[in-house]
Structure formats: structure tokens, C-alpha cells
Amino acid sequence: MDFMKEYEKWLASPALSDAERAELESIRNDPKEIESRFYGPLEFGTAGLRGIMAVGLHNMNIHVIRWATQGFAQVICAEGEEGKRRGVAICMDCRNHSMEFARAAAEVCAANGIHVRIFESLRPTPELSFAVREYRCQAGINCVSRCLVTGAPAWGTAPAFRPAYQI
């Protein structure tokens, strides 16, 4: 992947806010920073989608959340109308834009015709597990943060986006 082309594509996107565009403009003369943000997409690991909060393809931000949720929604839609009717439960914790990310995930799912149950306030992870079973949801999405290991950089926590799918 040509990270400079990807950077320019993002910079030209009408989906960016003024603040996001300014953030990308601020790194225009820093090829190492541009490469770190655009060398490839953020990948799912054992704890879900996790990354540093910043604008870019390889960072945690609202655009990456929407992209990941769209892929997840396609999996649910492949189950047919029953999967869409059963829908998803979505919860969040109190850190790092969790509520914003949860709402964005809900919007993407709803736009795909998937029934959404989103908690109105912060909830612990076990409550999401309970909700998925109690409401017989097709899936659950948890927008949370996890502390990083000792010696982590100053940014301290990394948000995690963890969709879960069960058949």
C-alpha cells in the first residue's frame, strides 16, 4: 500500500471534520508519522480492534469504527432477515470516545437494516454478554478501553472495539 496516496486520499475526503483535516495537515512534512498512520489498515487482534487515537487508517477513530462496523454488518446481513431481526446489542465504557464510537456503530448497523439495542449509559462488559443472551441478539459490540502494559507511552490507554459474533 502506498501510504502517501492513502494520506492524500484521506486529506481530500469530505467526511473529515475541520479538526481532523487540521490534524492531518499538521503532519504533512513528517513522512514517518504519515507512514505510521497510513501504511495499512488497523487489524483485529485477540482483543478486537485496538489502536492509538488519531486520524488515519492505522489508528482508532470514528472512520475506522464505521469501516469495521460495515464489515461486521455484512456478516450479520449474510445470515438473512432473521439475523438482522435478532440484531446487535452495543455497550460502551467511560473512556476515549466510547459513546461516540458506540453510536457510530449503531448508525452503521441500522443503515444496514439491523435491529440495534444500544445501552443508554455506560455498562460493564458482562452486562453486554447478558444482553446478547437475554435478547437473543445475533451479535454484540463492545466499545471499551483497556490499560496498556507498564512502560506504555504517555497516551496510556488504547480504545478497543470488539464485535462478537456467534451462530
Mark where each language-model region is:
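Residues at secondary-structure transition points
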Residues: 51-57, 146, 157, 162
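Ferredoxin-reductase
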Residues: 9-13, 83-159
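Gly/Ser/Thr-enriched, mixed-charge loops and adjacent short helices
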Residues: 33-38, 42, 153-167
